[in-house]
UniProtKB/Swiss-Prot annotation:
Keywords for this protein: Endoplasmic reticulum, Glycoprotein, Membrane, Signal, Transmembrane, Transmembrane helix
UniProt KW Signal keyword: yes
Residue intervals on the Lumenal side: 32-1155
Function: Component of the multi-pass translocon (MPT) complex that mediates insertion of multi-pass membrane proteins into the lipid bilayer of membranes. The MPT complex takes over after the SEC61 complex: following membrane insertion of the first few transmembrane segments of proteins by the SEC61 complex, the MPT complex occludes the lateral gate of the SEC61 complex to promote insertion of subsequent transmembrane regions.
Name by which UniProt lists this protein: BOS complex subunit NOMO2
Annotated organism of origin: Homo sapiens (Human)
GO molecular function: carbohydrate binding; ribosome binding
Signal peptide per UniProt: 1-31
Presence of keyword Endoplasmic reticulum: yes
Bilayer-crossing regions: 1156-1176
Disulphide bond pairs: none
GO terms under cellular component: endoplasmic reticulum membrane; multi-pass translocon complex; protein-containing complex
Length: 1267
């Protein structure tokens, strides 16, 4: 049976679909129908790798190896036959260090929708080799973990990968493609001696050229005194193995005053503790060291414990433990006017508000007899300010930190010559000191009666400003300077001064002609009513003006002459701190006003100047004002893309008026561009019914018009020369005529056209030509009239496209298919003629087309550098004959053939022959596959020439056999989906096979080796629904034949869980009780509910044995207003087969109620029952049932009587009577129960319904021995 079909290549880019091998059931048949599906694909790589080193393996989901194969050495193709449906894992197993994506693929083979059945490729893509290396500690065979190692291309800065070293210093990069790389190591604290190396990756894994070396590791510790950190303690480092040259970042000079005690130690260097008491050695190589602390004060050397400490540096930073402690003084200081400043003499220094000393001329002071402790120090000096300092004084602080001045006085004075008349004189002003530094702080003080003031300021840059009241500012009071900048450094500033300011304002007037009489005004903008005017007069074209004694403020200066144009008719000036000058008014012309419906350009011509243009103005829509430079009558002509009511207008400067211009049409432009000069006609249709269709053309191109103009100019010059020649006579005719040439016509060609449209008009433009195609065929445009329409129409015309081609060598009947690029269906199909040629056209030249060719038995490939030409190659074929070792045809063999982009997988039929036709010339790789057989040759590369037909013979040898059987239930029904396995025994224990039964319960275990004994049994995994098998296993011994009729009976798991229980409570509450069952994740909705009725026992319908969590809850309808009670609940998991639970319910009444004693009612019946029990028990049972009913009635009557009694009686009698009644009933019940010969299930059922029985039933049974 043929279950797959290959296909030849119609071109190098065409790939045949993977073969889908469908099949059929498992049974004793031995043939191709046993194959369910074939899974194949490629191992792909962009770089050259050895495919023969890679294996593809198929595992079951439980990890059993089902099949393995290698890849085609030429293209990495692989194929694996599957004989069972189910879940599998496909893995690629390359050499160690090679990376692929993905590494595994999970398969669910159902024979219908999985990737193998559908013929899809399963591809593994090579992503690179591995690069290995080490980071070592200097002089050591191992290295540290945690060093950051980066990989980058040689000569670049960009990182490709980063990793960190593992313990021992090893590191590795994966997925590295061939190339030259640089490896760099970094660490935030460790010093690296060799921080980089190189590696070259070619076609396998690579190692770094050399190891990276860590020079050393940082070692740190700390020292304290009385719990406080100590600064300045020296720590000396010694070693007998490490040299000074290997230690980095450490002071190697000797320590004055230190006497070594151990001569065997070699001194290396020392470090000093910092402010926080910490010390560190920057870089120490791995090895053993000794550290000795040394601390000498100003006059004494202190002891430090421990006095010596040995430690070892391995491959990491080290924190020295324990902490060092200093075990077992006048101090001096200085007062400075700034950091690194001069000393402040005569400053008073106070210690804890008690001890006072004065500083010397250099600012120094000395405090005697100081003990270790915390002190408060304060310094005082006129015009200098200091902050109080709290300091810890200890033996390590013989020199106190400098006391630095934090502030200085800034003082000054305000001088006002006279106050404005409109305000009352003030005696005091607020003065503000503002910082120019980052904090931008403000300080405000008030002057004294004499105008003096002072600030306290820290060093920095400041400005001082006087806050003049707004009323005084409006009145013109201004102080100069407005702000006083100053810098406070290391001494007070005492020379800040402010004085009053008055100014003058001056300027000039420039006229085009004689100025005549003009008026200039100065008006205050901040003080209403303050206005001053100057009348200017003169027969000159320039005049000056000046306003004196102007108070500071904002002013508006204006010049009055409405019919003239001024560069500035008014100016605003502000008098601040200086006089204002250079104010200028300049006349620019004579005013003209016009109203326009659109923005246009106006050309002005003045009478008396001929056609000379005296002005061109670009004006906007609306009312425009502009100036004419001369007086007189002007002719005004609009120039724009709009047409107006008049072609021109007149204006007289002696009679000013507003010119009004309204547009009625708008100029629309269009262009048609072609690659050839052809006849072009344009039809324009308007949306306005009254406008007829306009036909323009045939149009002339811009190039044609330019040529005609050149010809006209040449003709005019020729006629001029002839005219001049006639006048000059014979003498002129002796000269040869001048030959003039015109420009050649060259494309593209542009055809321009235009149309005057009304506002809101919609036009449709349609071009036409005999030989051109237009894109688009027509265009619409709407003219709004708001602005120039411009070029609204742009259409391109192109000549039709013709596609032509040739087949080499000449081949008739080749099918040529023309398609638009991206289209799903072909546009045109033609066949080549007897010359092997074809031609298609005309086509739209602006579209892209694809040209393909095909002919049975040929491969056609496009000729490089041409469009539409193809080369034809005759295809080749290969025929395979596959036989068994007895020379009989071998059906069912899967033969995989691949080469280049071609691959095919076919099954041999009954004749054992497979033929692959229509193959392109080239190399091919074939591999026969069938489980339980080996083949010779097992695989081979073959070379196929053009038109060649090869014949290859393959022989298959049987190497293993199969076991057939069925799995059924006890009643003979087949069991589908049971996982079976054959487990090898004794010397064959490493071998095993597995499979799954089909829908008929049949199974086939393939690949069983001759001479081996196997146990055929159910697999431990995947058979959760099966409880056991009979027999547990079947023993088979494999010879040289298949084994049949290995049958096994299985028993399914019972998937049921029983839930029962009982309630311990008084029977009077039973009618009010319900038992509810919930799933633990949903306690809002019970899944089952049962009512107790008159029984203490309950049972739920069977549950699924699903391992879920459940909750059983007892619920009651007893009113909470009368009873207090707790509703019990029990949680459990549905594991196993049965669960019995007990719930206790003990409600109590909120108000005690009296019960009528019931002992007198039941004593006689109980006594009679005991006497007659042994003789008439067959007659006593009905009587006992009747008695039980009567007792319940009596109980109810007693309850009713109790309810009707008064509350006071109930309170007095309830407790006493209830106790006596309970004891008496219990004794009578015990006696009767122990004398009844049939106490058992029936007795429990009868007595459990009594009001008191449930409380004493269990206790009574235990006491029967006493009776």
């Amino acid at each position: 049976m043929l279950v797959g079909q290959g296909a030849g290549l119609l071109g190098p880019a065409v790939v045949t679909a993977a073969v889908v091998l469908l099949l059929s059931g498992v049974g004793p048949a031995h043939g191709s129908e046993d194959i369910v599906v074939g899974c194949g694909g490629f191992v792909k790589s962009d770089v050259e790798i050895n495919y023969s080193l890679i294996e593809i393996k198929l595992y079951t989901k439980h990890g059993t190896l089902k099949y393995q194969t290698d890849c085609a050495p030429n293209n990495g193709y692989f194929m694996i036959p599957l004989y069972d449906k189910g879940d599998f894992i496909l893995k690629i197993e390359p050499p160690l260090g090679w990376s692929f994506e993905p590494t595994t693929v999970e398969l669910h083979v159902d024979g219908v929708s999985d990737i193998c059945t559908k013929g899809g490729d399963i591809n593994f893509v090579f992503t690179g080799f591995s690069v290995n290396g080490k980071v070592l500690s200097k002089g050591q065979p191992l290295g540290p973990a945690g060093v950051q190692v980066s990989l980058r291309n040689t000569g670049t800065e960009a990182k490709i990968q980063s990793t960190v070293t593992q313990p021992g210093g090893k590191f590795a990069f994966f997925k590295v493609l061939p190339g030259d790389y640089e490896i760099l190591a970094t660490h935030p604290t460790w010093a690296l001696k060799e921080a980089s190396t190189t590696v070259r990756v070619t076609n396998s894994n690579a190692n770094a050229a050399s190891p990276l070396i860590v020079a050393g590791y940082n070692v740190s510790g700390s020292v304290r005194s009385d719990g406080e950190p100590m600064k300045g303690v020296k720590f000396l480092l010694f070693s007998s193995l490490v040299t000074k040259e290997d230690v980095l970042g450490c002071n190697v000079s000797p320590v004055p005053g230190f006497q070594p005690q151990d001569e065997s130690l070699v001194y290396l260097c020392y470090t000093v503790s910092r402010e926080d008491g910490s010390f560190s050695f920057y870089s120490l190589p791995s090895g053993g060291y000794t550290v000795i602390p040394f601390y000498r004060g100003e006059r004494i050397t202190f002891d430090v414990a421990p006095s010596r400490l040995d430690f070892t540096v391995e491959h990491d930073s080290l924190k020295i433990e324990p902490v060092f402690h200093v075990m077992g003084f006048s101090v001096t200081g200085r007062v400075l006017n700034g950091p690194e400043g001069d000393g402040v003499p005569e400053a008073v220094v106070t210690l804890n508000n008690q001890i006072k000393v004065k500083t010397k001329a250099d600012g120094s002071f000395r405090l005697e007899n100081i003990t270790t402790g915390t002190y408060t120090i304060h310094a005082q000096k006129e015009h200098l300010y200091f902050e109080t300092v709290t300091i810890k004084i200890a033996p390590n602080t013989p020199q106190l930190a400098d006391i630095v001045a934090t502030g200085f006085s800034v003082c000054g004075r305000i001088s006002i010559i006279r106050f404005p008349d409109t305000v009352k004189q003030m005696n005091k002003y607020k003065v503000v000191l503002s910082s120019q530094d980052k904090d931008k702080s403000l300080v405000t003080v008030e002057t004294d009666a004499h105008g003096s003031f002072c600030f306290k300021a820290k060093p920095g840059t400041y400005k001082v400003q006087v806050m003049v009241p707004e009323a005084e500012t409006r009145a013109g009071l201004t102080l100069k300077p407005q702000t006083f900048p100053l810098t406070v450094t290391d001494r007070p500033v005492m020379d800040v001064a402010f004085v009053q300011f008055l100014a003058s304002v001056s300027g000039k007037v420039s006229c085009l002609d004689t100025c005549g009489d003009l008026l200039v005004t100065l008006q205050s903008l901040s003080r209403q009513g303050e206005k001053r005017s100057l009348q200017l007069s003169g027969k000159v074209n320039a005049m000056t003006f000046t306003f004196d004694n102007v108070l500071p403020g904002k002013y508006k200066i204006s010049i009055m002459h409405e019919d003239w144009c001024w560069k500035n008719k008014s100016l605003e000036v502000e008098v601040l701190e200086d006089d204002v000058s250079a104010v200028e008014f300049r006349q620019t012309g004579y005013m003209l006003r016009c109203s326009l419906s659109h923005a246009i350009t106006l050309e002005f011509y003045q009478d008396g100047n001929g056609r000379e243009n005296v002005g061109i103005y670009n004006l906007s829509k609306g009312v425009n004002r502009f100036c004419l430079s001369k007086p007189g009558v002007y002719k005004v002509t609009p120039r724009s893309c709009h047409r107006f009511e008049q072609a021109f207008y007149t204006y007289d400067t002696s009679s000013p008026s507003i010119l009004t211009l309204t547009a009625i049409r708008h100029h629309v432009l269009g262009t048609i561009t072609t690659d050839k000069m052809m006849d072009v006609t344009v039809t324009i249709k308007s949306s306005i019914d009254s406008e007829p269709a306009l036909v323009l053309g045939p149009l002339k191109s811009v190039q044609e018009l330019r040529r005609e103009q050149q010809l006209a100019e040449i003709e005019a010059r020729r006629q001029e020369r002839e005219k001049n020649g006639n006048e000059e006579g014979e003498e002129r005719m002796t000269k040869p005529p001048v030959q003039e040439m015109v420009d050649e016509l060259q494309g593209p060609f542009s055809y321009d056209f235009s149309y005057w449209a009304r506002s809101g008009e919609k036009i449709t433009v349609t071009p036409s030509s005999k030989e051109l195609l237009f894109y688009p065929p027509s265009m619409e445009a709407v003219v709004s009239g708001e602005s120039c329409p411009g070029k609204l129409i742009e259409i391109h015309g192109k000549a039709g496209l013709f596609l032509e081609g040739q087949i080499h060598p000449e081949l008739e009947g080749v099918e040529i298919v023309i398609s638009e690029k991206g289209a799903s269906s072909p546009l045109i199909t033609v066949f080549t003629d007897d010359k092997g040629a074809y031609s298609v056209g005309p086509l739209h030249s602006d579209l892209e087309y694809t040209v393909t060719s095909q002919k049975e038995g040929y491969v056609l490939t496009a000729v490089e550098g041409t469009i539409g030409d193809f080369k034809a190659y005759a295809l080749a074929g290969v025929s395979f004959e596959i036989k068994a070792e007895d020379d009989q045809p071998l059906p069912g063999v899967l033969l995989s053939l691949s080469g280049g982009l071609f691959r095919s997988n076919l099954l041999t039929q009954d004749n054992g022959i497979l033929t692959f036709s229509n193959l392109s010339p080239g190399q091919y790789y074939f591999k026969p596959m069938m489980k339980e057989f080996r083949f010779e040759p097992s695989s081979q590369m073959i070379e196929v020439q053009e038109g060649q037909n090869l014949k290859i013979t393959i022989t298959g040898y049987r190497t293993a056999y199969s076991c057939y059987g069925t799995v059924s239930s006890l009643n003979g029904e087949p069991e589908q989906g049971v996982a079976m396995e054959a487990v090898g025994q004794n010397d064959c224990s490493i071998y095993g096979e597995d499979t799954v039964t089909d829908e008929e319960g049949k199974f086939r275990l393939r690949g069983l080796l001759p001479g081996c004994v196997y146990h055929v049994q159910l697999k431990a995994e995947g058979n959760d629904h099966i409880e056991r098998a009979l027999p547990h296993h079947r023993v088979i011994e494999v010879g040289n034949n298949d084994i049949d009729d290995v049958n096994i009976i299985v028993f399914r798991q019972i998937n049921q869980f029983d839930l029962s229980g009982n309630v311990i409570t008084s029977s009077e509450y039973l009618p009010t009780l319900w038992v509810k069952l919930y799933k633990s994740e949903n306690l809002d909705n019970p899944i089952q509910t049962v009512s107790l009725g008159q029984s203490l026992f309950f049972h739920f319908p069977p549950l699924l044995r699903d391992g879920e969590n459940y909750v059983v809850l007892l619920d009651s309808t007893l009113p909470r207003s009368q009873y207090d009670y707790i509703l019990p609940q029990v949680s459990f998991t549905a594991v196993g087969y049965h669960k019995h639970i007990t719930l206790i319910f003990n409600p109590t009444r909120k108000l005690p109620e009296q019960d009528i004693a019931q002992g007198s009612y039941i004593a006689l019946p109980l006594t009679l029952l005991v006497l007659l029990a042994g003789y008439n028990h067959d007659k006593l049972i009905p009587l006992l049932l009747q008695l039980t009913s009567r007792l319940q009635g009596v109980g109810a009557l007693g309850q009713a009587a109790s309810d009707n009694s008064g509350p006071e009686d109930a309170k007095r009698q309830a407790k006493k009577q209830k106790t006596r009644r309970t004891l008496r009933l219990q004794e009578e019940f015990q006696l009767m129960w122990c004398l009844v010969p049939w106490r058992g299930t029936l007795g429990i059922h009868l007595f459990s319904s009594l009001p008191f029985a449930s409380e004493i039933l269990l206790e009574t049974t235990a006491t029967c021995i006493h009776y």
